[in-house]
Amino acid sequence: GADESLLDTYQAERSPHVRRIVESAVGFGRIICTLDVDEAAGRDQTMIAAREANPVDIGGAPMPSLSGSNLVTDGAGYVVGDSRIEGRILDELLDGRWAVIGREDSLTDDDRRVLSGLDAVVIDDDGDIVIVRPDRIVFGTGRTALEALADVANRYSLAG
């Protein structure tokens, strides 16, 4: 199994993430739950005007990324989006495992050894390499992420 020090990364990684989510929820709560009638009317007018000025649906609230551990690389740490690859739902392809999405022919023999040791799934797709953790968090992208994954697999004895 994995080295027990892997568990030490959990608090460092999740605490800032949860803090940002709670702060965001409190901020939205202040906007939504005002008891002042005049303040609520002003808020409503501002939001209606903003929606009319820019009617494009921007989706849900942004989700903060994970940070604070070596289990994500710079610019990563977000939950991978729901999508389809070759007509299949990405969750079905990920199957709760490490995954590499991208051009399979860009992987080196060393990459393949690391991925095999992790029992990672390789999803051949056009575009840059994206590495997804078993918890659906983007570990990183590109060649540097593949190298970082090899380091993490070694450091925490993740390879079988």
Annotate each predicted stretch with a short phrase:
Residues 2-160:
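Helical substrate-recognition/capping region of FAD-dependent monooxygenase/halogenase enzymes
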